[in-house]
Amino acid sequence: MIAYHADHVGSLLRPSGLITAREDAAASRISQARFKAIEDRAVEDAIRLQERVGLPVITDGEQRRLSFQSRFAESVSGLGDWDLNAFLWGHWHGDLSTVGDVTIERPAGLGVVEKLQRSRYLSVEDFVFLRARTTCTPKIALPSPSLWANFWSAQSSRAAYSTLESFLADVVDILREEVAELVRIGATYIQLDAPHYALLLDPATRSFYESQGWSAERYLERGIEMDNAVMGDFPGVTFGFHLCRGNQGSRWLASGGYERIARTVFRRVRAQRLLLEYDDARSGSFEPLKEVPEDKWVVLGLITTKRPHLETMDELVSRIREASRFVPLERLAISPQCGFSSSVIGNALTPADQERKLRLVVETAQRVWGEATRTATN
């Protein structure tokens, strides 16, 4: 198992030139080849940033993604028409003077309309590109399969899939094939992003899934079973599992501690590293960490990606010591609380803010553990 005391969730701010190029490519103002070259350069810059601050885990910054989950929708047919709001709907809360609350409605026509057919792998090409450009450990993030329950509709999807369960079974198969191919070509660290579980703390979100025929409790239990099916049994591969409460334009969807889901998620999910959000009071206490079994690490997301304010190292060290009351220090790590840009709409920080926060991750790990990186095999 990979054992790093410094980690990060994955996404980084998109350069303005990349955002403009994406719009230009969509409008056919530039060629796809030109857009690909701009994407490649953005990924290379993201890699250099992570290496510069000393991170042992390197991602492509998700520079090629519209959203952290969009690679799936881009790689299969059958989902019908969708846009960015398919991944963003909900009531978003803001706490900055310049970032207020906003509500994004669920697109009325959203829904799988045909049997899913994979047209390409989601992230295999991205991994090959990334691995060729760094000597550090490359990490690829994939969406949790049950996150796609959002795309099944009782009104428009029954002709393709009579039940939500049958739809998600095909999602699991596609993601399981993706993981198997990534492992075959050499991936050793794969992360599943699962923000929807913590969102079950929110009454509106619970109500939506119950309207689809699944209670929140069943959704959580079956969701973890699906996650475990995707991760499978791959010796030598470390799986991360990221839980947050929504991260978009410096806003969030839900508040509350992990108490209601800790026993099910922390104990039953097959992942070896739990990347948890703990950047402010709305994240709750460390008490739920008592449910973490001895074969798992906890990556404490203590450094916020939502605000430019830079935490002090003393503050971070104190919080790590507090968490060590529930999980031994040697099985803890530190990271930012979430990505810096879970979609092309990044958080309200500058690239300089982002770099300072990533550097603080590494420096804090060095202070607490004497090193930011360590690789071990158990």
List each model region and its residues.
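Domain-level signal for soluble alpha/beta catalytic cores
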Residues: M1-N378
